[in-house]
Amino acid sequence: MYKLVLIRHGESTWNKENRFTGWVDVDLTEQGRNEAYQAGELLKEAGYTFDIAYTSVLKRAIRTLWHVQDRMDLMYLPVVHSWRLNERHYGALSGLNKAETAAKFGDDQVLVWRRSYDTPPPALEPTDERAPFNDPRYAKVPREQLPLTECLKDTVARVLPLWNESIAPAVRSGKQVLIAAHGNSLRALIKYLDGISDSDIVGLNIPNGVPLVYELDEDLKPIQHYYLGDQDAIAKAQAAVAKQGKAG
């Protein structure tokens, strides 16, 4: 049996402001830093250790990983930073308040943009300053692979090459792997691992800063998965994530 640990970054400044974030590189709040420290403490107390970690190229995930490493005394851990683990790109919604957007377009439309599998939000214009083309962190990524908007289907297609070419081989080799990423890049991976249908994935909500443990068989098929921590608090956090895109 293999174990894989996933963690969504701690609360970011735009999580706190209920704004669509996507590829915008916002930082953690004080609460987000505390969530990351607590995640590291939970993992340490439960006896976990790691051989390698994967994260995105966005600071809220990177800093979450730092805090987990710090609390676990694993600052030496090899880390792979990949744009493929970035949050889903929210296109022209990037920076908008979710509740205000729902009030303007309706709860149902915003739910489709946030959680449906194959309907992306309106795209950014290529000349928009939020477009990734001139960002140095993507200088080595072919321009045609850089998104101006994404649906979850696009995010799955972006994440899976990293899983197949690097993460899965690391797990199979016996390495203890930690992935610190984002709500939708983790939803994309979980959809693949658990075989969740395109319709059912709408209901999957991942709380900030809570370790999610996957136990996998020899074929890397899930045996079971579970969150570490106070289960009632985790359920409340998941419900709060689900409510973020509603007008009222």
From Swiss-Prot:
Site features described as Transition state stabilizer, chain residue numbers: 182
Reactions performed catalytically: (2R)-2-phosphoglycerate = (2R)-3-phosphoglycerate
EC number: 5.4.2.11
Keywords carried by this UniProt record: Gluconeogenesis, Glycolysis, Isomerase
Pathway it works in: Carbohydrate degradation; glycolysis; pyruvate from D-glyceraldehyde 3-phosphate: step 3/5
Coiled-coil portions: none
InterPro entries for this protein: His_Pase_superF_clade-1, His_PPase_superfam, PG/BPGM_mutase_AS, Phosphogly_mut1
Keyword Iron: no
Active site: 9, 87
Family matches, as SUPFAM superfamilies: Phosphoglycerate mutase-like
Single Gene Ontology MF annotation: phosphoglycerate mutase activity
Complexes and interactors: Homodimer.
Family according to the record: Belongs to the phosphoglycerate mutase family. BPG-dependent PGAM subfamily.
Function: Catalyzes the interconversion of 2-phosphoglycerate and 3-phosphoglycerate.
Protein name as it appears in the record: 2,3-bisphosphoglycerate-dependent phosphoglycerate mutase
Organism: Burkholderia ambifaria (strain ATCC BAA-244 / DSM 16087 / CCUG 44356 / LMG 19182 / AMMD)
